[in-house]
Curated annotation (Swiss-Prot), chains A, B:
<dbReference type="Pfam" id="PF01983">
    <property type="entry name" value="CofC"/>
</dbReference>
<keyword id="KW-0808">Transferase</keyword>
<keyword id="KW-0547">Nucleotide-binding</keyword>
<dbReference type="GO" id="GO:0043814">
    <property type="term" value="F:phospholactate guanylyltransferase activity"/>
</dbReference>
<dbReference type="InterPro" id="IPR002835">
    <property type="entry name" value="CofC"/>
</dbReference>
<comment type="pathway">
    <text>Cofactor biosynthesis; coenzyme F420 biosynthesis.</text>
</comment>
<dbReference type="InterPro" id="IPR029044">
    <property type="entry name" value="Nucleotide-diphossugar_trans"/>
</dbReference>
<keyword id="KW-0548">Nucleotidyltransferase</keyword>
<protein>
    <recommendedName>
        <fullName>2-phospho-L-lactate guanylyltransferase</fullName>
        <ecNumber>2.7.7.68</ecNumber>
    </recommendedName>
</protein>
<dbReference type="GO" id="GO:0052645">
    <property type="term" value="P:F420-0 metabolic process"/>
</dbReference>
<comment type="subunit">
    <text>Homodimer.</text>
</comment>
<keyword id="KW-0342">GTP-binding</keyword>
<comment type="function">
    <text>Guanylyltransferase that catalyzes the activation of (2S)-2-phospholactate (2-PL) as (2S)-lactyl-2-diphospho-5'-guanosine, via the condensation of 2-PL with GTP. It is involved in the biosynthesis of coenzyme F420, a hydride carrier cofactor.</text>
</comment>
<dbReference type="GO" id="GO:0005525">
    <property type="term" value="F:GTP binding"/>
</dbReference>
<comment type="similarity">
    <text>Belongs to the CofC family.</text>
</comment>
Length: 236, 236
């Protein structure tokens, strides 16, 4: 299986601009990418990063500490292939689907809660000529596996519903993958809560995920007000 | 397994008051309860409703059309036992845990996306003397299975983290159940989006869930603005 991780290298995570500066958003996006790449390699697959611009995984990714169950041929993070395609997400992903000669998995780079277990379930899902989708909040397509040669993505709007419809049109059986972890993408300040709550369960070694660690370094902590949990940032 | 569904019968879903009147909130809460009870009965378990006040399931629940895989002894919705306990949620649930002589599952009544498959996975999770929790957004405890005799709940705040800590204190192994469907409780207007997106996959018969149908009857439809999906209400 060809596992592709699209990554917006240039202006990542603009919806977090209320709480994070541009360099902080870049650092957080890199930490999430590193967590996602680690989780994928721990399933035994070698991911390909589909980046909007050239990217050094060795120096900017902080994913040099790959899991011990690294797939053959992957010695360090710098061995993870990076494909540069500066087109919008949908066009870049469809180029990957068109060129593919094997099943393709597309895993978003901001699935900071992704675990090897959740990804393994995803990769094993879907019929031999079908499509499997892990939906996100608001009808997003957070991760999918494409085994039908004619399936193409369109990430605009409620893409999960559009992808269901498209799959039905081309006769591709569609399976919905039920995962809270894959369903949680980090786009908005409220999503940071999930990283801090679940970050310690995400890392394979029982430690904390890179994303959670980075958030704490930036001063974020959980805060409970009126029975509801939010994040607060200490800028001292 | 004793499956308990706590239900706030009197003033349900106050956080939806921006978009729904009190009688509409009551109707929506009843539809969600009916969907949850149907999904539980389809797993072969007889749920008990733990209600804050007396409740007629036959006339107010719209769950008279039980699934065909109804457990033995459950002929109609009016056979679903209702226990009335007007104490706050935590106290009422802990009374159930204290009295239990078998494993107890607590499933919130607003898990409108719950499917028999997701619930079956939950019910089968957790060690013989442990606890299994399906967390919700913001660290909530949306559903759990308790097999350790000393485990007690506390639903205030980030209850998922508190429950993890409590389980560790009493030596109960804790398993986190990874489910988008069980992780989605319907509390706020933004959650209604999920009901409309996934409602058609939720009903066992391939139709639409009662909750989604009720929302459409109330005039709610999905709306895509700037690539993001919200609900809009047509009050005409």
């Amino acid at each position: 299986m060809h596992v592709v991780v699209p990554f917006a290298a240039d202006t990542p995570k603009t919806r977090l601009s209320e709480v994070l500066s541009p360099p902080e958003r870049t650092a957080l996006a890199r930490a999430m990418l590193a967590d996602v790449l680690s989780a994928i390699t721990a399933t035994g697959h070698v991911p390909t990063v589909l980046s909007t611009s050239p990217l050094s995984l060795e120096n900017g990714c902080s994913c040099d500490d790959l899991p011990s169950t690294t797939p053959p041929g992957l010695e360090s993070a710098s061995d993870i292939p990076v494909t540069v395609d500066d087109r919008p997400l949908t066009a870049a992903v469809n180029a990957q689907l068109e060129a593919a000669e094997e099943p393709v998995a597309i895993v978003m780079a901001d699935l900071a809660l992704a675990t090897p277990a959740a990804l393994s379930t995803l990769f094993a899902s879907g019929a031999a000529d079908g499509v499997a989708i892990a939906p996100g909040r608001g009808g997003g397509t957070n991760a999918l596996v494409v085994r039908h040669p004619d399936f193409r993505v369109d990430y605009h709007g409620a893409s999960y519903l559009d992808h269901r419809e498209h799959a039905a049109e081309i006769g591709a059986p569609l399976e919905s993958v039920d995962s809270f972890r894959l369903g949680t993408d980090v786009d908005e300040p409220a999503d940071l809560v999930e990283v801090l709550i679940h970050g310690r369960e995400t890392a394979a070694d029982g430690g904390e995920s890179r994303t959670a660690t980075r958030l704490r370094e930036l001063g974020f902590e959980l805060e409970t007000t009126d029975g509801r949990v939010t994040v607060a940032r200490d800028r001292s």
